[in-house]
A protein has these predicted regions:
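Nucleotide-activated chemistry modules centered on ATP-dependent adenylation/adenylyltransferase
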Residues: 2-10, 15-401
Length: 401
């Protein structure tokens, strides 16, 4: 008897990957291994349901690959160091997790000696590139299967196939589709498809439950979140989740992102990301007090590239390790507590407490009495600084300004 070919399906439990498991097992005769790579977006209940469904769909084995810590250590902390917001708006939420999901799937495929890897991406988005590119690089020679893309399947066709073969689940096309992750939730569909419309309150998974305002104190050590309102967290994932819990109650972190996809078309996505926006907001605020002008400037330049490369499936590019080294080194004096004021749908910065505060120094306070120089020193400095302009206008006296 001919041995069945092994295929690892990157299994999220959604429609496309559910169809993929059943179709490959039933129609193609593969020995299907369903692997759910969790980067912090799945609850225990969801993972349990995924396991039950995978076996019902025909998988011979189901595994959960927990890569949440790896995701934080190898990318997320650098996104915080760099205050990474794509187009100044979007914290690269779920998209930043895809590479680590793909890497986990690739490692598992090599571990079991799989001949193929399958995923449920369509042909219209960025995820197909993130998954395919990672598999091509990390598992050369292993076949990549993408049924939804290659067979040009509609959601209804996949639903009909599953129902026909005895698997019934609620895959009814909802008005919105959600991708929930540790670093935020993206929202697609509905009003998102109309450039002139925003999302209604009901579109958000987390509703506003708090009124009034409160202060949030986020303490950082070497740029990493260390404590939330005085509570120390050795587990950085738990710290992020705590900030999310606090901020989501105010509906903080909601916005609309418009950007260019890897394949060249513009895309629009809604998102809710309380923890990312609060943590980045606090971290950036603290850096204004603790970093030099040029540290901030150059860090912003490389961080922008880091975010762009991460979004565009270039995490494996060697220059990313160089950027990470620079970002890591830049954080040695980013220590202290940033204080934020939260209110429904917004927050503002209040102040910082830091031993590395460069604002409070013996040299003087902005707009007040100088302590590190004399009045004559100041006048001399101003005269020297003005030299290039004085030379220029002395030679161009007729030039109007």
């Amino acid at each position: 008897m001919e041995q069945k070919k092994k295929v690892v399906v990157a299994f999220s439990g959604g429609l496309e990957t559910s169809f993929t498991v059943m179709y490959l097992a039933k129609e193609k005769g593969y020995e299907v291994y369903a692997a759910c790579a969790n980067t912090g977006g799945f609850s225990e209940e969801q993972l349990k349901q995924n396991e039950e469904n995978a076996y019902k769909l025909g998988a011979v084995k189901y595994v959960t690959l927990d890569v949440t810590q790896e995701y934080y250590e190898k990318s997320l902390k650098y996104m915080i160091f760099g205050n990474v917001l794509r187009n100044g708006t979007y914290p690269i939420s779920v998209s930043s997790e895809r590479i680590f999901q793909a890497l986990a799937i690739a490692r598992y495929a090599k571990e079991i000696g799989a001949e193929a890897i399958a995923h449920g991406s369509t042909g219209a988005g960025n995820d197909q590139i993130r998954f395919d590119m990672t598999f091509l690089v990390m598992t050369p020679g292993v076949e990549i299967i993408t049924l939804t893309r290659d067979m040009s399947l509609s959601r209804q066709e996949e639903i009909d196939y599953l129902n026909k073969n005895g698997f019934e689940a609620d895959f009814t096309k909802l008005k919105y589709s959600y991708n929930v992750g540790l670093w935020g939730t993206s929202i697609c569909g509905g009003e998102i498809l109309d450039s002139a419309q925003g999302l209604p309150e009901t579109a958000y998974l987390k509703q506003v439950t708090k009124e009034g305002s409160e202060l949030l104190r986020l303490e950082f050590k070497n740029g990493e979140l260390h404590a939330v309102n005085g509570e120390v967290f050795e587990d950085k994932i738990a710290a992020i989740q705590k900030v999310e819990e606090i901020g989501a109650a105010y509906g903080i972190g909601r916005d609309m992102h418009v950007g260019d996809t890897i394949i060249g078309i513009k895309g629009r996505v809604g998102f809710e990301a309380a923890a990312p926006m609060l943590i980045i907001g606090a971290h950036r605020f603290l850096e204004k007090y603790t970093l030099s002008k040029w540290q901030q400037y150059w860090k912003d330049q490389v961080a922008n590239w880091y975010g762009m490369f991460l979004h565009e499936s270039q995490y494996l590019e060697p220059v990313m390790r160089d950027i990470e080294a620079m970002l890591q080194e830049s954080q040695r004096n980013v220590n202290g507590t940033a204080i934020l004021e939260l209110r429904p749908l917004s927050f503002s910065t209040v102040g910082v407490e830091s031993q590395d505060d460069l604002v409070k120094t013996k040299f003087g306070e902005y707009g007040e009495m100088q302590k590190g120089w004399t009045a004559e020193d100041a006048k001399g400095f101003i005269k020297v600084t003005s030299t290039p302009l004085r030379v220029y206008y002395a030679n161009h006296k007729d030039e109007e300004v």
